[in-house]
Amino acid sequence: MKFIIKLFPEITIKSQSVRLRFIKILTGNIRNVLKHYDETLAVVRHWDNIEVRAKDENQRLAIRDALTRIPGIHHILEVEDVPFTDMHDIFEKALVQYRDQLEGKTFCVRVKRRGKHDFSSIDVERYVGGGLNQHIESARVKLTNPEVTVHLEVEDDRLLLIKGRYEGIGGFPIGTQEDVLSLISGGFDSGVSSYMLMRRGCRVHYCFFNLGGAAHEIGVRQVAHYLWNRFGSSHRVRFVAINFEPVVGEILEKIDDGQMGVILKRMMVRAASKVAERYGVQALVTGEALGQVSSQTLTNLRLIDNVSDTLILRPLISYDKEHIINLARQIGTEDFARTMPEYCGVISKSPTVKAVKSKIEAEEEKFDFSILDKVVEEANNVDIREIAQQTEQEVVEVETVNGFGPNDVILDIRSIDEQEDKPLKVEGIDVVSLPFYKLSTKFGDLDQNKTWLLWCERGVMSRLQALYLREQGFNNVKVYRP
């Protein structure tokens, strides 16, 4: 089998040296992706296309599908390469190849020709088109908007019968631009923004700020692995996980409510910039869109950017949510994003949309920056190729109950502000308050002879914190969902 890879048009308008470099990189990327399907596969680069030849017919569909997902490819032609002697020979071969497709259809013939011949491309189109029209009674020539277009390519003494055309994702080959670090949360925005930078030729590494234990991290790892495996598997990339619960706890405990959102983002940018510097990455990528939430106003984004010299790229800055969700659906991350949990208690109730630098800096003086340094130092760096195996590990299950027994105590893990606004009172059982950001350090001080029923408004944080406590060896925890 043979495929002809057509280059993304922006590649073809580059200078000769740049174009050759892009083609060389794309050829290497294709080899890296396809070597898993057929070890005998050959990839040959030319000035205006790349040929892929393989022997294993069983891998035809898999190879074709993989090619449509490699950045830098405009479209793929699946072809049959045969010798020919003259125009009549071209017609006879086209008749055998296309007869069934043209029955009862309107059609036209389009020919591209390279080399020296005693006929032109138009001569071949007329001869082959006329012959097909005469020999297939139910077919009819229609030069504008035909139902079927017969594509032929003539190169020297070879005829390429084009059996199918398949659209690629376009863009630049990965590796033609410098590396970036994507701040991935598993939601709609970060997945789409990561894809857009891969499509633009960047090797995208991932940085994840963990707020909810192993279950949360496993979910986001699956999104990152999916994106890499589907669009970026030609290159090795890193997945860096940072346990950000201590940072969130420090913010919730010491920072004024209205400034929490901006300061949390500033802390994330500081941490990600340190990771980027450690690995020689040139820029950060976020999924922020202008005005989508309170921290994404121009004033707040400027204040967030000010904490780092690292370039921050925001490919979705002018996109609306509907457009982003449609893109997520196209690339296959929509289902991941819809099931990714939201975290109660992390977002302030009255966030500022126009933060003042002096106020932000005054609030940050209350923050213990040694906590930020520590979580960055302890960040977990994994080769993304290992994630498939690691995410298969069993996540400890935790029981969810809607009632309680005589030895049970409800543990309200919401933030202090939420508890003050909506105190939890349940008849017949004691309720103890312990904000989620203190669980890792204070849960062991509670009476371990009791069974603790963790509760929060949405039930997401309580489940994740119960999973975390189970992983730490506390088996006396359940999730309370009345």
UniProtKB/Swiss-Prot annotation:
PROSITE patterns the record matches: RHODANESE_3 (PS50206), THUMP (PS51165)
Location of the active site: 456 (cysteine persulfide intermediate)
Transferase is among the record's keywords: yes
Record-listed ATP binding positions: 183-184, 265, 287, 296
Name of a matching Pfam family: THUMP
EC number: 2.8.1.4
Listed name of the protein: tRNA sulfurtransferase
Source organism per UniProt: Escherichia coli (strain ATCC 8739 / DSM 1576 / NBRC 3972 / NCIMB 8545 / WDCM 00012 / Crooks)
Organism classification: Bacteria, Pseudomonadati, Pseudomonadota, Gammaproteobacteria, Enterobacterales
